[in-house]
């Protein structure tokens, strides 16, 4: 009898331990603040991508009614500083994290970040409609950006320090040299368009998603205010090209860059769900419709543009 009682007690103890273990697992699961298709998160995004990311978030939230993605649009350098902020789940910029940034995330949050190029973007050059010149070689651009062009043109950016556009220009066009002190910093990409539209001797540099979609009413209104410049092609014998989707795809247009997300999650949360959406069929189609070039699913084809290039 005593032996049976001991066996019964051991059995009960075993059941209690199992119950506590299962309860603990369930509690851990329930403590997750979000899931791929449910919850709310905050992400930090390069301001030059605002039009296409606004559309991306709107479609995602429409497809997933239980989700809310708060987007903070900032200069790229500030987005990368946000990798150090616990509440920022994802950033979207034009480059991947570097080794220092990766190690900081691993050490601080015990998270191994994930990064993926989901689209290809370009920097569009715009001029005032009354400007006599709208075709520029790369040497012309370098001269303008350094203040030694034959005509006094004023470069205009969405900031002159921490933005992805300025970083690209300094790294890829000026090859490390400094911008002219005459460069003007607008408050945003829309501010660049507004400044150029009012200043005949201004030349602006903005992301193509602000002005590349001729089917978007807002961008059509921008196109009525400024003129898109043609830039000397990367390939000999082609002449001058504009930042159209076909030219971005082939890299015939020389000012091409990436759109990259960096995800900070140690479980499959809403950030994971949004990342999967951007790299999936619908997200890649949204990039294509915005006249960027999808980089994950490349079987959508490139949209033709019925515009004669000079």
Q: Which positions does each model-derived feature cover?
A:
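A short beta-strand-loop structural module common to alpha/beta enzyme folds
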Residues: 68-76
């Amino acid at each position: 009898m005593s032996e049976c009682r001991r066996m019964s007690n051991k059995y009960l103890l075993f059941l209690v331990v199992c119950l506590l273990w299962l309860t603990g697992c369930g509690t851990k699961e329930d403590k997750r603040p979000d899931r791929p298709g449910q919850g709310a998160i905050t992400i930090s995004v390069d301001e030059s991508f605002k039009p296409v990311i606004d559309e991306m978030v709107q479609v995602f939230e429409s497809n997933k009614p239980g989700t809310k993605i708060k987007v903070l649009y900032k200069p790229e350098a500030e987005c990368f500083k946000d990798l150090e902020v616990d509440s920022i789940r994802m950033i979207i910029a034009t480059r991947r994290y570097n080794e220092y940034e990766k190690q900081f995330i691993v050490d601080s949050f015990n998270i191994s970040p994930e990064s993926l190029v989901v689209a290809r973007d370009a920097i569009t050059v715009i001029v005032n409609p009354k400007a006599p010149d709208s075709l520029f070689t790369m040497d012309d651009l370098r001269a303008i950006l350094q203040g030694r062009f034959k005509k006094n043109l004023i470069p205009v950016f969405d900031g002159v320090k921490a933005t992805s556009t300025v970083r690209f220009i300094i790294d890829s066009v000026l090859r490390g040299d400094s911008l002219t002190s005459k460069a003007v910093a607008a408050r945003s990409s829309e501010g660049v368009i507004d400044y150029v539209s009012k200043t005949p001797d201004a030349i602006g540099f903005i992301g193509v998603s602000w002005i590349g979609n001729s089917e978007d009413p807002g961008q059509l209104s921008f196109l009525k205010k400024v003129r898109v410049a043609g830039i000397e092609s990367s390939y000999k014998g082609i002449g001058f090209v504009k930042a159209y989707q076909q030219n971005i795809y082939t890299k015939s247009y020389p000012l091409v860059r990436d759109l990259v997300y960096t995800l900070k999650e140690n479980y499959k949360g809403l950030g994971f769900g949004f990342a999967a959406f951007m790299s999936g069929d619908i997200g890649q189609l949204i990039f294509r419709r915005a006249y960027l070039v999808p980089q994950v699913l490349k079987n959508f084809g490139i949209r033709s543009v019925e515009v004669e290039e000079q």
